[in-house]
Amino acid sequence: GLLDYDIFIANPDGSELRNLTNSPGSYDAEATISPDGESIVFTSTRDGDLDIYVMDADGGNVRRLTDEPGYDGGAFFSPDGTKIVYRAYHPTDPDELAEFRALLADGLVKPSRVEIFIMDADGSNKKQLTNNGAANFAPFFHPDGKRIIFSSNMHDPRGRSFNLYMIDVDGSNLQRLTHHDGFDSFPMFSPDGKKLVFGSDRNASDE
C-alpha cells in the first residue's frame, strides 16, 4: 500500500545517498527532476490526499501544486521546465469520492478512470487534455514541448489493452501510435526525439 515511502537522491554510482523528504507515514514517491536539475516534482499524501508537490533539489522549499480531491501523480517537466504534465483521477460522485478516501486511509487506490492534465510549473493554468473516461496514464513530453505521449486503453471496450497515443498540449490532434493487443506503456523519448523507449508485454510468452 501507500504507507511510508520517501524520496532519495544519490550519485549515479550510488554514493552520497540522501533522504530528501523524511516524512514518516506519508507516501512520497513518483519523483522526477526538472531539466535544469534544480527542482523535483513528486506525489505525496502528506496533506491527506494524493497531490503533486515540487521541491528544490536539496529537499527544501516544498510547495503543493494540486489540491483537487483524488489522485494526482506521474508528473514530468516539459523540456524547457515551464510546464508539468501529469495524470489524475478526480472522483466527483459523492459515493465514489467516499470510497476513494476510505481506500486511501488504508494505503490503497483503485482508480479506473484517469485523465491527462498539464499545468504551469508553479501549479497555475491547469488544463485537462483527455476526457474519454478511460485509463490514460504515463504521460511524457515530446522533446519539442508541443506534444504529449501517453498510454491508454481508450480503444478497448474491455479496458485490457493499452496502447501509446500522442496529443498536442492544447488537447487537439490525438493520434494512436501503437496497435497491440496487450500492454504498451511508460513511454519516454530520447532528448533528440529520434528514439522512443517504452514497456511492453509483446514479447512475453503465454506460459
Predicted regions and their residues:
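Residue-level detector of Asp-centered blade-edge/turn motifs that repeat once per structural unit
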Residues: 35-36, 79-80, 143-144, 191-192
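A flexible loop/linker signature enriched in serine peptidases of the S9 family
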Residues: 1-7, 19-28, 43-52, 66-72, ...
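A short pocket-lining beta-strand/turn micro-motif at the edge of beta-sheets
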Residues: 173, 183-185, 192-196
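A structural signal for short secondary-structure junctions
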Residues: 142, 157-159, 188-191, 204
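Short loop/turn segments that connect beta-strands within beta-propeller blades
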Residues: 11-15, 56-60, 120-124, 168-172
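Hydrophobic beta-strand positions that form the internal "hydrophobic ladder"
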Residues: 40-41, 84, 148, 196
